[in-house]
Amino acid sequence: MKGCRESNEAKESYHVIDPAKNGVTWLFYKGEFKGKLPDFSKLKPAKKGESYNISLKKIDLPGGSYAMQFISNLKIAKAGKYTFYINSNDGSRLFIDNTMVIDNDSEHGARELSSEVELTEGMHSIRADYFQAGGGKVLSVSYSFGNSGKQFIPESLLFKSKE
């Protein structure tokens, strides 16, 4: 047909989340945490909330110094070697099944570190610890598997409990 040309196929993907099941619990701690992450076992959270991902976005945060923990369970569909990434300003650590897999602690500008982790199919606990000593606020956790490329962990794979 004159004036027509073949167009590229448009693709979009959506992740369905269930607010009763999917989510990340975050804990907020007031204080001066200069230089390194605090010992969270000695602190009481000043605030607690829920989000759908491990990120500072969409959380109303004050200026100044504070620390946070993000706690969830990650559903792994296929066993294998996964690469996890944590990007933060200031310090952070990432734990999978209560084992620290990335130590990005100390005061610094936005810096991303990564680590490979062998995971079985099923649910795995995931926790990110973070502190802010002033300046820019950055925290994000992403992963890759096989040829998938690095991506934020889909909200549909983060669960409030292991059930």
Residue ranges and their predicted role:
Residues 3-83, 87-163:
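Extracellular/secretory pathway-exposed regions associated with glycan biology
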